[in-house]
Structure formats: C-alpha cells, structure tokens
Swiss-Prot record:
Keyword RNA-binding on entry: no
Disulfide bonds: C1-C13, C2-C11, C7-C14
GO molecular function per UniProt: toxin activity
Source organism per UniProt: Conus araneosus
Keyword list, A-Z: Disulfide bond, Secreted, Toxin
Expressed in which tissues: Expressed by the venom duct.
Lineage, highest ranks first: Eukaryota, Metazoa, Spiralia, Lophotrochozoa, Mollusca
Record's protein name: Conotoxin ar3b
Subcellular location: Secreted
Family, similarity comment: Belongs to the conotoxin M superfamily.
Chief place of localization: secreted
Amino acid sequence: CCDWDWCDHICTCCGG
C-alpha cells in the first residue's frame, strides 16, 4: 500500500 487513492477509493499505488 502506498497511500489512499481517490481514483479507486482504496489503499494502493494508483498513478505511481
């Protein structure tokens, strides 16, 4: 997990 991602509304690595 990187941080909270608003694009998928989950804790992941979205958009680097």
